[in-house]
């Protein structure tokens, strides 16, 4: 029987070589995805119609596709040459093309010298349809999520294991460990990981750490979309997008995340309706009994209580649990997405900065809850205390690779320093040894009597492993300009202030607070207690209903909003952003200002939209400090910042000569900066004399009373 390639050549003798290669590639690599001739027609039919011109109609194209489909099906049992082959290592196409001088150019990227007979747009559409079909198939076995993930620029390549592939295809792979070896991850033209390995043992809790912009979030997305090969029998959930707005009550939304329970209950209702109508069959009665047994096995009757406990821990009151999801803000819907993931209990839970959406109380509850988590967790977090509480292992992303460490974050810091020290010693020792041998070679290179010894030394050098110098991460330095004159109190105060949006729901009653240029005030409290509202009253953005706001005439406030990204123009570069905000200054001044916060070189010229969350925050800091304020009001400034930048921010605030009031949920950052702790609750603000230790103890006691501990 003719092969697919022979069929194409005979039916389309004028076919362009590039199109021929593309079509045969689709046929061989996607043969397993073609369940019928319709699938094959959908994948390549439009292209073949374009190639044929007027020589074949739709029926003719379909007949050709039918022949090729039959060939593929018959070739499946014995074919070796046309099946997919797992590579021993990733292949970089750019490296391959460097070796060819024949002038071949990639389609769609370079203009061809000769004209093509194929419509490029149709070629792209065909590729997109095939890719969408493959992605849809790979996602069938994942748990239900509120929204699909979309990756437009990220890509991955991975060396395959024939043994693991055979186990997976045979259905005999029962391990819940995730082992991915020798893989690359790129974002656009940037290589984020090269030849990396990741091993996630079943039941372990992993913290993924690294500097902003290195690819932590991209790695999670690659795992979530199975662009990196995760065994199909392992269920996974990635908490990334907030729950959709609709009329579903919050509690019901959480219950629906358990697809197994929902499917059993739906089938149970159908069978019960048949029985009630007297239309039951013998097999249905047996099926109903089996469903009841499965529901009992998964403790379906206890599910509402378990979902309610999770929601309560994340701050949802009984009343809020019955509210439709459309009535919640984006932050609360993100909490709801986290609650759904915790309730569904996937085999692999992927969390990206889960503490960003939570207040201190909810973070402490989540720490306690995750410590008894039965399956595997991989969490990206820059909250040092949170990682110390929940992580049993740390994965460090740096220098385009992943290094694993046993223990919590503090253990990781010590182990990393020891590893770097040992690597540096080993490198220096080898350099000295190499130099010693090289001196001998140089001295006796032209001495005939020593020729054999020189050759021996040269072979020794060749056999030495090539050690690279230790790649040390640069220190993060931040500095807030403070070239201003000090002035005497009162600086900023609220006196007997009442505030509300609706008289039925008073937020503050008789609020009196004050701050000066020596203040380092940290504000904590549950979400919705009024923390951000109080900051806006201090800023003067909101006017008190009653009472007085007093601000010194020389006071110049710099404000950092927790929604700072919404205030940035994402379509321009960071340099252009500052130039529009503060026109008339030389470009070097904008670059210098951005460089203070780690946005330098090509980063400063890239569109802000292409920067990571932490890099966007740094741009916002550069913009905020450009006018040289003497007082800062910061609302969740550590969100999206890496740990090194958080430490640098804390040091910069401590060295700043002006005043600071900030809202934060990051325990370490609060301890680093705070001299005074305010708690927003019950329509007022309470000063906690014992600082964060006292506040944490109060929350733990509250958990015990409520039965969370």
Curated annotation (Swiss-Prot):
<keyword id="KW-0051">Antiviral defense</keyword>
<dbReference type="InterPro" id="IPR017871">
    <property type="entry name" value="ABC_transporter-like_CS"/>
</dbReference>
<dbReference type="Pfam" id="PF00005">
    <property type="entry name" value="ABC_tran"/>
</dbReference>
<feature type="modified residue" description="Phosphoserine">
    <location>
        <position position="161"/>
    </location>
</feature>
<feature type="modified residue" description="N-acetylalanine">
    <location>
        <position position="2"/>
    </location>
</feature>
<feature type="binding site">
    <location>
        <begin position="525"/>
        <end position="532"/>
    </location>
    <ligand>
        <name>ATP 2</name>
    </ligand>
</feature>
<dbReference type="GO" id="GO:0016887">
    <property type="term" value="F:ATP hydrolysis activity"/>
</dbReference>
<feature type="modified residue" description="Phosphoserine">
    <location>
        <position position="283"/>
    </location>
</feature>
<dbReference type="InterPro" id="IPR050611">
    <property type="entry name" value="ABCF_EF3_subfamily"/>
</dbReference>
<feature type="region of interest" description="Disordered">
    <location>
        <begin position="129"/>
        <end position="171"/>
    </location>
</feature>
<comment type="function">
    <text>Displays an antiviral effect against flaviviruses in the presence of OAS1B.</text>
</comment>
<feature type="modified residue" description="Phosphoserine">
    <location>
        <position position="157"/>
    </location>
</feature>
<dbReference type="InterPro" id="IPR003439">
    <property type="entry name" value="ABC_transporter-like_ATP-bd"/>
</dbReference>
<keyword id="KW-0067">ATP-binding</keyword>
<protein>
    <recommendedName>
        <fullName>ATP-binding cassette sub-family F member 3</fullName>
    </recommendedName>
</protein>
<feature type="modified residue" description="Phosphoserine">
    <location>
        <position position="83"/>
    </location>
</feature>
<keyword id="KW-0547">Nucleotide-binding</keyword>
<dbReference type="InterPro" id="IPR003593">
    <property type="entry name" value="AAA+_ATPase"/>
</dbReference>
<dbReference type="GO" id="GO:0005524">
    <property type="term" value="F:ATP binding"/>
</dbReference>
<dbReference type="GO" id="GO:0051607">
    <property type="term" value="P:defense response to virus"/>
</dbReference>
<feature type="domain" description="ABC transporter 2">
    <location>
        <begin position="492"/>
        <end position="707"/>
    </location>
</feature>
<keyword id="KW-0597">Phosphoprotein</keyword>
<dbReference type="InterPro" id="IPR027417">
    <property type="entry name" value="P-loop_NTPase"/>
</dbReference>
<feature type="compositionally biased region" description="Basic and acidic residues">
    <location>
        <begin position="129"/>
        <end position="143"/>
    </location>
</feature>
<feature type="binding site">
    <location>
        <begin position="210"/>
        <end position="217"/>
    </location>
    <ligand>
        <name>ATP 1</name>
    </ligand>
</feature>
<keyword id="KW-0007">Acetylation</keyword>
<dbReference type="Pfam" id="PF12848">
    <property type="entry name" value="ABC_tran_Xtn"/>
</dbReference>
<keyword id="KW-0677">Repeat</keyword>
<comment type="similarity">
    <text>Belongs to the ABC transporter superfamily. ABCF family. EF3 subfamily.</text>
</comment>
<feature type="domain" description="ABC transporter 1">
    <location>
        <begin position="178"/>
        <end position="424"/>
    </location>
</feature>
<feature type="compositionally biased region" description="Basic and acidic residues">
    <location>
        <begin position="161"/>
        <end position="171"/>
    </location>
</feature>
<feature type="modified residue" description="Phosphoserine">
    <location>
        <position position="155"/>
    </location>
</feature>
<dbReference type="InterPro" id="IPR032781">
    <property type="entry name" value="ABC_tran_Xtn"/>
</dbReference>
